[in-house]
Amino acid sequence: MDIWHRLGRIFRISNLGTLIFFLLNIGLILALFCPYGVTFEAAAPLVVCYIVTVLISLSPIGEWTLAALAGAKEIKRKDIKIRLIPLLEIVFEQAKERTPSMVNSIRLKIIHEQSPNAFAIGRRTICVTDGLLNLSDEEIMAVFAHEVGHLAYQHSAIQLLIGGGNLFISGFLLIIKVVCWMIMGIFALVGISTRSFWGGFFMTLFGSLSTVLIWLWTKFCMLFLMWSMRQNEFVADEYAYKLGYGAILASVLDRHMCSAPSNGLLKALYATHPHSDDRVARLQELGANYSRY
């Protein structure tokens, strides 16, 4: 039964965009490197390379690397540990009662920034900023409940999985770019040696077209991934609500961690988080007793 609960949390509508993102990129690689059909001999090296990158990204090494890139460090100050760790333990125990299949422990790291913020990384890491310490205990617990929701639904682990896939896909896109540069170089040499206008023209056209196509493909695929990330914010908010932190989380989102995508349709489509008003409204629809006015 536990495995079905785990699969149920992963295969949700909110993760549909992530799945489409993954399938589109894998489909592109297979189309480029297996143009005459997918055979075991052709696909096996690709699968092995992909599995290796995914295993590395899902390992503690991948989690540690992502935390390091985010600037997250181990908490050394005793006063910060005394303040935060008991609050996280309370929320974590509540989450374990609701989701017994969760990891057995959570690591807490800190980022030295003054704006209040927190985010989950991998399977068991939550990062907080210095600014979060300015919130009340109840508000910090509400933020923890949201981040624990990401861990419970394995959103951050899926992001690591996608990160490994991106590393794999980026390598192949780099190969494509190198091939394009080589072809451009050939056109350039032909144009120089023959003093041909058309050689230079085709070189410029091919280089520009290949760059634009790769950029468009990347942006198109990212639309689906960003959609999933925004939907998963609602899912984590709902998890916090079910743990009893709905009204407090709505207050934090409204007063301390207000976020709004930049103006414009495209910027909104590529935003990682929904507008704070939308998140507060969703919590109110769930039953959170919160009103700012």
Q: What would you call each of these model-derived segments?
A:
Residues 2-3, 15, 180-251:
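Metalloprotease/metallohydrolase-associated module, dominated by Zn2+-dependent proteases
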Residues 98-122, 221-231, 235, 240-293:
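Active-site-proximal gating segments in proteases and membrane effectors
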Residues 1-55:
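N-terminal low-structure segments adjacent to metalloprotease catalytic domains
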Residues 44-70, 213-225:
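Transmembrane alpha-helices and immediately adjacent membrane-cytoplasm interface residues
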Residues 25-40, 170-195:
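Juxtamembrane "helix exit" motif at the C-terminal ends of alpha-helical transmembrane segments
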Residues 155-185, 250-259:
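Post-HEXXH active-site segment of zinc metalloproteases
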